[in-house]
Amino acid sequence: MLTTRFSILIFKMMKITVLGSGTILSGPVRKPSAFLLESAGHVALLDMGPGILYQLSVLNIDFLVPDTVFITHFHLDHCSDLFPYLMSRYLLDNGSNKRFKIFGPVGLHHWYETNASLQGKWLNDCKPDVIEIFNNNIQWADQKVLVYPTGHTNQSIAYRFEGQKKIFFSGDTGFNEELISFALNAELGVLECSHPDEKPVAGHMTPKEAGRFAQLAGFKELVVCHMYPENDTKELSQKLAMEYQGKLIIPEDLDVF
């Protein structure tokens, strides 16, 4: 079961815990981007890069409690802890993975089966429900979940959760006007903000781009994540505020919203 901090599982609105707000190069300060989502008695993970099992352990969260994981894309900094997590669940309860769902973009089945083929009986006999979602929507807990391609890779997707509150997770993406339309009027937007304005990298956003994205999308609150060390500076909030006029949050790992 969850610890006292997470003992009440019925929430009026989704509760979000930042498991990782950085990148694979962030060192001990920030783990790669990942989030714990809690809503209406359900618990899910959104992305599972390296170090996320450690974060769950720090929070004393029973590995069997989450029922779902949402994957944005297949780069290792967003999904490498998934199979260790499935092994942990199997060792705790060898039938538990049959009650677990993995949602992700087109290509999820191939990615999963390729990795599972190297693991043997423990995984192949206790397979979770692997579900590809693209240009359609699903239901999780009391949330309608929609996805949209980001262009970061051929398969990468962003997620939009619609319950009592609309919440948008960009995953990895560059500045994308079509994605802004998909994110429009979310109360909370969680955007990647990888590199400084003076060193832009294709497929990622700078503070100026993330701030502009949030302003055009009309977010009431902006949470930035996926910050490389060179962009994780004291000036980051000022740079974002030059474009975005709403409530700005630069989180620390394990912050709760």
Where would I find each of the regions flagged by the language model?
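Conserved beta-strand hairpin/beta-sheet module of binuclear metal-dependent hydrolase folds
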Residues: 9-59, 156-171, 188
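Ala/Thr-enriched low-complexity intrinsically disordered regions
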Residues: 3-4
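Active-site neighborhood of phospho(di)ester-bond hydrolases with catalytic His/Asp-centered motifs
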Residues: 45-49, 67-73, 77, 81, ...
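Cap/insert and terminal regions of metallo-dependent hydrolase folds
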Residues: 175-257
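Metallo-beta-lactamase
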Residues: 95-156, 163
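Hydrophobic packing residues within well-ordered alpha-helices of enzyme cores
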Residues: 56, 82-85, 112-115, 179, ...
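Active-site metal-binding motif and surrounding structural segment of the metallo-beta-lactamase
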Residues: 51-101
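Adenine-nucleotide cofactor-binding loop residues
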Residues: 49, 151, 174
